[in-house]
């Protein structure tokens, strides 16, 4: 029961942290002076790094080795982007932008693959969890316009689904599968 609560708390924290950063930082398509302030750099890197922990935790909830392995790709991409952001914006090493983009690409591809794995191999209500990586992809693509609210809704939904689905036994989940 404690693991269930911690998992749900992590999911809720990801959504709240991302939304909080998005509101405070007020991202734009233009480069801003605050973008390279250490507080913003570290906060943004921290929010990205949260995904590296949350995505594999989500995959464990779904179950199966394939889901977990695919989630590691997304987590590695998030970690790479997080570290690259510190060098790019914090230390003003502009060439590291390409490393940031590479990490973001791995993260997006991993999330896309995870969406497919959950949707096609998940059982019963656990298929609903495919909405979480899909929503995360949408939040990243629409980052400037609506990334914070989308991420908040996505990961709060993950927290609620984690609580709701974990109260069902595997036999109940199997019976609910069409």
Can you name each region flagged by the protein language model?
Residues 1-178:
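Hydrophobic, aromatic-enriched alpha-helical segments typical of multi-pass transmembrane helices
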């Amino acid at each position: 029961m404690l693991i269930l609560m911690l998992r749900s708390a992590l999911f809720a924290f990801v959504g709240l942290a991302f939304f909080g950063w998005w509101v405070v930082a007020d991202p734009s398509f233009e480069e801003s002076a605050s973008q390279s302030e250490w507080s913003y750099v570290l906060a943004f890197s921290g929010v990205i790094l949260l995904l590296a922990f949350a995505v594999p935790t989500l995959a464990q909830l779904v179950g199966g080795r394939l889901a977990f392995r695919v989630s590691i790709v997304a987590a590695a991409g998030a970690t790479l982007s997080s570290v690259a952001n510190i060098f790019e914006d914090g230390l003003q090493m502009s060439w590291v932008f390409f490393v940031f983009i590479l990490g973001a690409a791995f993260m997006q591809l991993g999330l896309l693959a995870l969406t497919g794995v959950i949707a096609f191999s998940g059982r019963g209500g656990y298929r609903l969890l495919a909405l979480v990586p899909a929503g995360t992809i949408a939040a990243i693509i629409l980052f400037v316009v609506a990334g914070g609210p989308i991420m908040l809704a996505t990961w709060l939904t993950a927290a609620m689904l984690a609580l709701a689905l974990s109260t069902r036994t595997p036999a109940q989940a199997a019976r609910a599968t069409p």
